[in-house]
């Protein structure tokens, strides 16, 4: 299905006890407040791109453009519309929204640390490449419970951000590493069968593609056993992913992307 004004329609089935209806409602509230250009990223964006609630997520994440590269201006505007200030963002409609701000950057002025630079590059890329979707969250009765229209990061941009995120997780955030790895695995399995993610990242700016090749080989091949141990600490679906599964999707993706970058 396609909404002529706001792109394809994605339907999420909301089972008892999950937060999809509430998250979608909060996302629509966010979209109706003119905070400027922004896009949905993070775990909820992955769910939308997979069209399934494949895991639990604790909040909504959004990237937004601001002139000074801080989220203070959009946060102030959201507070004026009834939100309350919270860690790294706001609470809106009972949902925590983590706001990450980006601004225009000059590549020569990026941080010397590659992973720090990739935080800026991948989040800026996710905002620039995001596409409009209409998201419908349906309750167990199958009645339409909430609808939102929003720009959502592409599967390729989500893979790049997640590869970077798991590199920087603290040692006590093993559950986050497991979630990041599972998100990338599911996105590659669902959207890179025809090389779509590899093709998009081959055209990404400022070395994103080559960096993703290196990270994917590390996470899904060289250290696939470690990644498997992360997943074993998660849900039954995460724990069911084998080392061979990881190596298959990761190697196909990395090989295809590397070949494209050589052309």
Task: List PLM regions with ranges.
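Compositionally biased terminal segments of proteins
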Residues: 1-263
């Amino acid at each position: 299905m396609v909404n002529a004004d706001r792109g394809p329609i994605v339907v999420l089935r909301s089972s008892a006890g999950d937060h999809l209806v509430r998250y979608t409602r909060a996302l629509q509230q966010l979209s109706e407040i003119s905070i400027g250009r922004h896009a949905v990223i993070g775990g909820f964006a992955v769910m939308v791109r997979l069209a399934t609630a494949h895991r639990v997520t604790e909040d909504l994440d959004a990237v937004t453009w601001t002139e000074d590269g801080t989220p203070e201006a959009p946060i102030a505007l959201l507070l004026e519309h009834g939100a309350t200030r919270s860690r790294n963002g706001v609470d809106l409609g009972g949902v925590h929204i983590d706001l990450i701000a980006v601004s225009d950057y000059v590549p020569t002025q990026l941080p010397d640390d590659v992973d720090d630079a990739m935080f800026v590059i991948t989040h800026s890329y996710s905002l620039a490449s995001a596409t409009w979707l209409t998201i419908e969250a349906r309750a167990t009765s199958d009645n339409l419970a909430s609808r939102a229209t929003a720009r959502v990061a592409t599967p390729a941009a989500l893979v790049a951000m997640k590869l970077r995120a798991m590199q920087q997780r603290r040692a006590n955030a093993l559950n986050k590493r497991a979630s990041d790895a599972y998100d990338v695995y599911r996105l590659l399995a669902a959207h890179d069968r025809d090389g779509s993610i590899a093709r998009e990242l081959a055209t990404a700016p400022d070395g994103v593609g080559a960096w993703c090749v290196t990270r994917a080989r590390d996470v899904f091949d060289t250290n696939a056993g470690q990644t498997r141990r992360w997943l074993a600490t998660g849900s039954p679906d995460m724990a069911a992913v084998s080392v061979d599964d990881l190596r298959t999707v990761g190697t196909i993706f990395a090989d295809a992307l590397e070949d494209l970058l050589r052309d």
